[in-house]
Amino acid sequence: MPTFELLIKGGHVIDAANGVDGIMDVGISGRLVGAVESDIPSSQGRRVIDATGKYVMPGLVDLHAHCTGMDGSFFPDEMCLPYGVTTMVDCGGSGWRTFDDFNLNVVRKSAVRVFALLNIVGQGMEGDVEQNVEDMDAEFTAAKIRQRSDVLVGVKVAHFQGMGWESIDRGVEAARLSGTFCLVDQQAKPSRPFSEMLERLRPGDGTTHCYGYDKPIIGNDGKVKSHYIEARKRGIKFDVGHGGASFSFAMAQPALEQGFPPDTISTDMHRSSLLTSRATMTEVMSKFLAMGMPMAEVVARSTWEPAKWIGHTELGTLTPGAPADITVLEFQDRPAGLSDSGDSGPRILRAEGRLINQMTLRDGVVKFDYDGMAKDDISERPTTDLNLP
């Protein structure tokens, strides 16, 4: 009798949590990973999937995307599962006033596992787009996070155009009170230099859009600015958050060459970023692969590293007993044009190919199957009763 409901054989398995990077088989028992071994007999799988020539990895974890609170936000399933994302973090779309509605209408209805960073503004990204200082309440924000820690994993501060540090200071305080982290999206201003902003963050806090042209990590001398290097030494994290106007090869390429990779790879996906820059997880991963980042590192920063940051180490791994969230990617070996975004162009990186998603499993169930890897061939007789009147 087969041991596993599903057996994925012959793929190149990458699991950063366990140091796995090679040809392995993955057995799935119900909703959980059952085994990751070098050669599991095909007889042990009720259904066997041939993943030869493909990469098998934990389901992708997108730390920064938008499925509520803004024009262009999307319902998670159709914009995550086709690109290998099984877990996403809504990045500040809701605040403490609006979270319950978001949870009812999006989180609970989505097949994708949805977490959220709670906006420091009570209304979230609705209305005046995060400018209302009076609605930035650290205690109410922290209380909601503590109340709904099953979904809420941190605090988001973004887009504040005022002169002072109120938004960031209150966001950091809310994170401190809730025992979580604060993620900041903030442009530099003469009254608010980026170097000082980084000093206001604590170890475990971070900033997104780290390679945005309007937040230049590279100075006029072509070097990574010293305050970024010092911040990383203090434990500040840096997220990609590609978006429609927040990723530049002119920033990312020299930063990588100088040993300053992102901690996490994410999309900042919304309608505009998808249409203008194709900001899907597989496409953003392809850009880092094309810039020379090894595949194992690309996968780690798209799975295990974001899972650790949000405090859910049961995810982003293929450890036996972990949820069977699994993504199967293939490198499409043909010339590809990979676009950046925003004020630097946009510009195109000519690459040898790109990653495409072949299959997405969520809790052991196939949710997306691009080439029908888990389906029977048409030569197999359908089971429908053809004698019906």
Question: Which ranges hold each PLM region?
Answer:
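C-terminal cap of metal-dependent C-N hydrolases
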Residues: 11, 323-380
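Divalent metal-coordination and catalytic microenvironments
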Residues: 11, 26, 31, 53, ...
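His/Asp/Glu-enriched, well-ordered alpha-helical/loop segment
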Residues: 250-335
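Di-metal (Zn2+ and/or Mg2+/Mn2+) metal-binding site signature of metallo-dependent hydrolases
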Residues: 54-77
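Histidine-rich, glycine-flanked metal-binding segment
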Residues: 1-57
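Alpha-helix-loop-beta-strand connector modules within alpha/beta enzyme cores
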Residues: 57, 106-117, 174-178, 231
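Active-site core of metal-dependent hydrolases
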Residues: 154-275
